[in-house]
């Protein structure tokens, strides 16, 4: 990473963090082996779905 | 902003109210449900900025995501779902630049309004592009290398060898997404023909296929309510 980009991130108080369910769903797009049941369980627990 | 509320909105036109994730999965399918959760989740963590119209920003991102997925499917790229996500988040670097260096962000906008290109203006003011910033954010979010690479190269896809077709899809999708800001003659004159051809499309099909793309419904506007 360029040092200038590192500096930009250092100037941001709260760099956004992605929810775990989103990380899993995005990685699942390139990994068909992730279990559907595991995803359903995660979605049921996540407040984004309520 | 909640997924269940959107699923039960008029947009989806479901005959009965959905109350559980299992019902949503059966009626919408996994692909559609994933799109909604990913989009909702990313919107939820990005801040609103006083000097940026965040609703316009997200509407543009929804269009870019939807168009990138369509382009990927039409040109038989391997991972159209990845292209949806990449298109959705490909502009997040702009938000981070506004957050971390608002003065430079305003300067860049002035240069662009004066007719300079965004990549040139960003490099001049910052030494890097918003796509590189977004790629670093995706790296921190532990997204896949394919997605990071596509976003990193999506500002100027032809500048990299070998040429990244996912980056070309995002670039063309973003250009079409910005159609509202241009008159039709200017839109066609500036159309990224080389990136379009890299995706396997013919130059003479631009008008016909763009009309199809502009008719696509993102179905995501309800997430901004």
Residue ranges and their predicted role:
Chain B
Residues 1-88, 92-103, 117-190:
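Conserved alpha-helical "signature site"
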Residues 102-113:
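Post-HEXXH active-site segment of zinc metalloproteases
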Residues 193-225:
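Terminal helices and disordered tails flanking the catalytic cores of nucleotide-processing hydrolases
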Residues 50, 111-112, 163, 195, ...:
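Juxtamembrane helix-loop transition sites at the ends of transmembrane segments
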